[in-house]
Regions:
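N-terminal presequence-like segments and the immediate start of the first folded domain
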Residues: 1-61, 65-70, 75-78, 84-133
Length: 133
């Protein structure tokens, strides 16, 4: 039997997200879908331009804020998809993820793409979370 669940939406940067037409995260039951995080300031301007490692750190920082809003950590992440405009540089810096995922790595995909929403963005990371009670 499927029970109805009311989605719970979360905006990290409400004005930016409304301008672009997305919600940063939505929780339904024990599952959370988190939109791709990019390296931006609160006004939506790209940060760490040209520095993929710092952009990656900024993505994880924003994702951590979303996870904490729902009482979760990176240990609850079950899917991580990474989109990057520079796969060789991402692969060279991917070891940073060892400081994020300390118990186990999630499933996911690493995809090299031609471009992201703004030309300055070099990486975008989206997550799916499952929180057991």
């Amino acid at each position: 039997e499927i029970k109805p669940e009311t989605p719970e939406y979360f905006y990290l940067r409400p004005e930016v997200e409304k301008a672009y037409g997305y919600t940063h995260a939505v929780k339904i039951g024990n599952d959370i879908k988190i939109s791709g995080a990019v390296s931006m300031d609160d006004a939506g301007n790209p940060t760490a331009v040209g520095d993929l490692l710092q952009q990656m750190k900024n993505c994880y920082s924003d994702l951590d804020k979303v996870l904490k809003h729902y009482g979760c950590t990176f240990d609850d992440v079950v899917v991580e998809n990474v989109f990057t405009t520079n796969m060789p540089e991402f692969l060279a810096q991917a070891g940073y993820r060892n400081s994020i995922y300390t118990k186990q790595f999630p499933t996911g995909s690493w995809l090299g793409v031609k471009e992201l929403a703004l030309p300055e963005f070099m990486i975008e990371i989206e997550l799916e979370v499952h929180k057991s009670h």
